Design a protein with these regions (language model features):
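Short, P/G- and charge-enriched loop/turn segments at secondary-structure junctions
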Residues: 50-53, 154-156
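Acyl-donor (CoA/ACP) binding surface of acyl/acetyltransferases
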Residues: 1-28, 62-174
Length: 174
């Protein structure tokens, strides 16, 4: 499934995205808010791209946003924890340092959320972030997600720490 916005092509990951994926997965700002392991080499980044493209179990769907002018990856967005019974899912994203401040995150989140409602039949998409991650709060609000509350100590951060978590939600009619 390929999605388009004014400035982006949002498509499934491909192994050729590995160099950008490697930079993304090792970026200090991404690592600060994502309790995932570091990416030690390009082969691991390539495998990450391959696994992101496998949507066969129906629990997630991942895309890479690319600049249509260069064809280079600028970000990653995933719809995950998809519950087909309750028709809800969660969305998360990351943006390469060189692409920050250009609306990439907002466009990715909005496009994938619309797809989740229109093509996947979901009735709710949630976006969660650590409260100190102000940039993610701005992205959520700009993409039409309402701030619904704060869950105490609910967000794991690297190093075994915990942060309070903002819960944002978006419904098809929002």
């Amino acid at each position: 499934v390929e999605l388009r916005t004014t400035d982006l092509v949002i498509r499934p990951p491909v192994p050729d995205d590995a160099p950008e994926a490697f930079v993304l997965m090792n970026d200090p700002d991404v690592r600060r808010w994502n309790p995932t392991r570091a990416c030690p080499d390009l082969a691991t980044a390539e495998q990450w791209c391959r696994s992101g493209a496998d949507w066969s179990d129906g629990s997630h769907a991942s895309w890479h946003a690319v600049d249509p002018g260069t064809g280079r990856m600028v970000g990653n967005v995933s719809l995950f924890a998809i519950d087909r019974d309750d028709l809800v899912g969660k969305i998360g994203y990351r943006v390469l340092p060189a692409a920050r401040g250009r609306g990439v995150a907002r466009q990715m989140v909005d496009a994938v959320t619309r797809w989740a409602f229109e093509s996947h039949g979901l009735m709710r998409v949630q976006l969660e972030h650590a409260v100190p991650n102000l940039a993610s709060c701005r992205v959520a609000l700009a993409a039409g997600f309402l701030l619904e509350g704060t869950a105490r100590s609910a967000y794991a951060v690297p190093g075994g720490g915990r942060e309070d978590c903002h819960l944002h939600g978006r419904l098809p009619g929002d």
